[in-house]
């Protein structure tokens, strides 16, 4: 049976790892073993943080909506409740964008939510 020489494959694998780690600091970009270890950690962080990013953005949107709603005299909780009762189906991403870039449209939505709230309070009290 012929002997299998693996030098080409090994060199290619090492080169790919070192190229992927090229932006890292110190030994992590120059030594294969350190670079490989750092790449494993980096991939783990990337995977984890791609999922965490979704929650981070939702939190940012809620903070922006709350600030704009309070500026219009309503808390976030009451604002979202009023929108739900009024049948307005706008997601938090769009609401946050309106709050930042189009204050007049957001104020109109606050009024829609405010108008829907007292009607709900009267029906629940009866």
Swiss-Prot record:
Keyword rRNA-binding recorded: yes
Record keywords: Ribonucleoprotein, Ribosomal protein, RNA-binding, rRNA-binding
InterPro entries given in the database record: Ribosomal_bL20, RIBOSOMAL_L20_CS, Ribosomal_protein_bL20_C
Entry GO terms, CC: ribonucleoprotein complex; ribosome
Tagged with keyword RNA-binding: yes
Pfam families found in the cross-reference section: Ribosomal_L20
HAMAP family cross-referenced by the UniProt entry: Ribosomal_bL20
Name the record gives this protein: Large ribosomal subunit protein bL20
Gene behind this protein: rplT
